[in-house]
């Protein structure tokens, strides 16, 4: 799953549990359904990834799709200018979105035998998440 900065789902790929995430990175980036502006020198498209994508395949997949990859190196923590550790990065955005989706019983326990049916159910749940976010935004205005 790929999400935007606030946790809104942008694209999802369904695969077996024994497939590593870095092998699905290109498919996941291609699954984004929202039109994005073409990256330029002044406005690049950034892609923040976790340490599991710290390999040549992860870097190449992000760059070939026009993104500037931000991948924390394995064993590296963010240090401030004095050399002390700063607050940990917010890597919980995708996990929070998966938590929202796990409230749907059909997604939490996969009853659908065909992957296309399961993908459709996930996409329906993602669209409901976007609808709820828009509805809350309208109420806050």
Regions found by a protein language model. Name each.
Residues 4:
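Short, acidic, Ser/Thr-enriched surface-loop or helix-capping motifs
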Residues 13-38:
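Active-site beta-loop-alpha junctions of metal-dependent nucleic acid enzymes
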Residues 18, 37-115:
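Helix-centered, glycine/charged polyanion-binding patches within enzymatic domains
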Residues 25, 50, 124:
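Residue-level signal for inorganic ion chemistry
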Residues 118-141:
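C-terminal domain-tail junction helix/linker
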């Amino acid at each position: 799953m790929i999400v935007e900065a606030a946790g809104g789902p942008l694209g999802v790929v369904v695969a077996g549990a024994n497939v590593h995430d870095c092998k699905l990175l290109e498919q996941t980036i291609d699954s984004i359904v929202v039109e994005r502006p073409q990256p330029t020198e002044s406005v690049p498209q950034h892609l923040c990834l976790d340490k599991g994508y710290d390999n040549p395949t992860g870097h190449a997949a992000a760059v070939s799709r026009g993104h500037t990859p931000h991948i924390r190196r394995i064993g590296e923590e963010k240090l401030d200018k004095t050399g002390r550790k700063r607050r940990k990065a917010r890597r919980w955005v995708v996990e929070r979105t998966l938590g929202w989706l796990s409230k749907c019983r059909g997604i939490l326990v996969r009853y659908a035998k065909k992957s296309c049916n399961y993908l459709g159910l996930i996409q329906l749940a993602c669209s409901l998440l976007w609808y709820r976010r828009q509805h809350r935004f309208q109420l806050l205005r």
